[in-house]
């Protein structure tokens, strides 16, 4: 998701 920690850019 947009705020998924390190993967926030997904």
UniProtKB/Swiss-Prot annotation:
Expressed in the antennal lobe (at protein level). One of its GO terms (cellular component) is extracellular region. The keyword Secreted applies. One of its GO terms (biological process) is neuropeptide signaling pathway. Its main location: secreted. It comes from the Eukaryota. The keyword Iron does not apply. The modification Arginine amide is found at residue 10. It is found in: Secreted. Keywords: Amidation, Neuropeptide, Secreted. This is Tachykinin-related peptide 3. It comes from Acrosternum hilare (Green stink bug). The lineage of its organism: Eukaryota, Metazoa, Ecdysozoa, Arthropoda, Hexapoda.
